[in-house]
Amino acid sequence: MSYAQTKTQTKSGYKAGVQDYRLTYYTPDYTPKDTDILAAFRVTPQPGVPFEEAAAAVAAESSTGTWTTVWTDLLTDLDRYKGRCYDIEPVPGEDNQFIAYIAYPLDLFEEGSITNVLTSIVGNVFGFKALRALRLEDIRFPVAYIKTFQGPPHGIQVERDKLNKYGRPLLGCTIKPKLGLSAKNYGRAVYECLRGGLDFTKDDENINSAPFQRWRDRFLFVADAITKAQAETGEIKGHYLNVTAPTCEEMLKRAEYAKELKQPIIMHDYLTAGFTANTTLARWCRDNGVLLHIHRAMHAVIDRQKNHGIHFRVLAKALRLSGGDHIHTGTVVGKLEGERGITMGFVDLLRENYVEQDKSRGIYFTQDWASLPGVMAVASGGIHVWHMPALVEIFGDDSVLQFGGGTLGHPWGNAPGATANRVALEACVQARNEGRNLAREGNDVIREAAKWSPELAVACELWKEIKFEFEAMDTV
């Protein structure tokens, strides 16, 4: 089209001014395509703003729209590229809240880029004045888009093959205190936990490189601890070496050094470091045969408020695409937020290949992962031996159960604390395999095992009164 033709068309087809979003972006007769990215938003409009207008504003501002009509709309095909609110449903018990379902054409997004998806869908609209609050509850990625991602570096089955460990959850421990230990004392704590029976130990999320413990020194002492523990136990062991760094270049430098030390797994804080850094590291991990543990530090800033932010199930789906072999998910029974149905909903979205819509668990869309490798769920935070039956029953085998204080707080030390957890785990797995009901008989299983394990008996006595009974905020 020539410039002259454009001028002629604008004179006849362009009308300047402001018009309601719903005239263009609210399309209740639209049927979503298999290739659309679908989003479910919990919308709280300002008083006096109609639901249809608020929903259409979200669709517009997260896709092609702006606050006024622009003549350059005539230079593109808005019907092809615009986001569409195709359905609105009320939120039970809330008079001024609703769920808006929005479809986005796939051509709006760069292939293989979670960074671009989030920049588009949640990058600007959350500050829109017409809305009191906005929360992205769920997102459906089409198979056509999933196929542009590598996903987890290895996945659950490959990890089990690397570790030669099958038929049970894996056991881990976060080294405490999280800050302040010298590299040598840190390595000592790692060794004691691993020789006591754990599969993994872990850097805490804020352990990077500090004056009291530089990253290279920590890596060296941890590598020595793992070598010694493996020689004594005959089992493959690992420690999540946190390679999160100020720059991507430094992050990859630390990852390379872990590989030189023949370490099987490294760790990354994916939200604070960002999705671009995480995808870069995940691709490096696949190319170099290293497992990748993901910590979700900062997630509660984004997902804890029920009316505003992004639900963790969206962050979990984004992580599966960006890449990670493990990710923290909460425990249901420990000190961190997490209602069982909601938690297991996003755990299924991490591990399973196909998950049906189930709004009772917060799953607004059926998700087909097109054989993308799964991510192992990590239960961590305020758990101890009395929680073991519930953890095994809730999370199943494809999980990592991480006891930080529940290992290091044992009166006899780190190794006995690790042994207590290993005995409790083995007892629960055996009882489950024999057909016993862990939900009903779990405490009996632990008591029976404690009769022949003094380490477990001491742990049971120490933590018999410890409970974290608070009402969950994360509900449908």
From Swiss-Prot:
Chloroplast recorded as keyword: no
Post-translational modification (record): The disulfide bond which can form in the large chain dimeric partners within the hexadecamer appears to be associated with oxidative stress and protein turnover.
Active-site residue list: 176 (proton acceptor), 295 (proton acceptor)
An annotated GO cellular component: carboxysome
Induction: Part of the rbcL-rbcS operon, transcribed in light and constitutively during growth on fructose.
Catalytic activity from the UniProt record: 2 (2R)-3-phosphoglycerate + 2 H(+) = D-ribulose 1,5-bisphosphate + CO2 + H2O; D-ribulose 1,5-bisphosphate + O2 = 2-phosphoglycolate + (2R)-3-phosphoglycerate + 2 H(+)
Record note on cofactor: Binds 1 Mg(2+) ion per subunit.
Residues reported to bind substrate: 124, 174, 178, 296, 328, 380
Main location group: other
Record key words, sorted: Bacterial microcompartment, Calvin cycle, Carbon dioxide fixation, Carboxysome, Disulfide bond, Lyase, Magnesium, Metal-binding, Monooxygenase, Oxidoreductase, Photorespiration, Photosynthesis
Site for Transition state stabilizer, residues: 335
Pfam family, one: RuBisCO_large_N
Cofactor(s) needed: Mg(2+)
Localisation per UniProt entry: Carboxysome
UniProt-listed GO biological process terms: photorespiration; reductive pentose-phosphate cycle
EC number: 4.1.1.39
Binding site for Mg(2+): 202, 204-205
Lineage: superkingdom: Bacteria
GO molecular function, one term: magnesium ion binding
Modified residues (N6-carboxylysine): 202
NCBIfam families: PRK04208.1
Functional summary from the UniProt entry: RuBisCO catalyzes two reactions: the carboxylation of D-ribulose 1,5-bisphosphate, the primary event in carbon dioxide fixation, as well as the oxidative fragmentation of the pentose substrate in the photorespiration process. Both reactions occur simultaneously and in competition at the same active site.
Note: RuBisCO folding and assembly commences when the nascent large subunit folds with the help of chaperonin GroEL-GroES. Both RbcX and Raf1 help folded RbcL release from the chaperonin and dimerize; dimeric Raf1 binds to RbcL(2) leading to an RbcL8-Raf1(8) complex. RbcS displaces Raf1, resulting in holoenzyme formation. The basic functional RuBisCO is composed of a large chain homodimer in a 'head-to-tail' conformation. In form I RuBisCO this homodimer is arranged in a barrel-like tetramer with the small subunits forming a tetrameric 'cap' on each end of the 'barrel'.
Protein family per UniProt: Belongs to the RuBisCO large chain family. Type I subfamily.
Quaternary structure, from the entry: Heterohexadecamer of 8 large chains and 8 small chains; disulfide-linked. The disulfide link is formed within the large subunit homodimers. Forms complexes of many stoichiometries with Raf1 with and without RbcS. RuBisCO interacts with the C-terminus of CcmM.
Protein name: Ribulose bisphosphate carboxylase large chain
Organism: Nostoc sp. (strain PCC 7120 / SAG 25.82 / UTEX 2576)
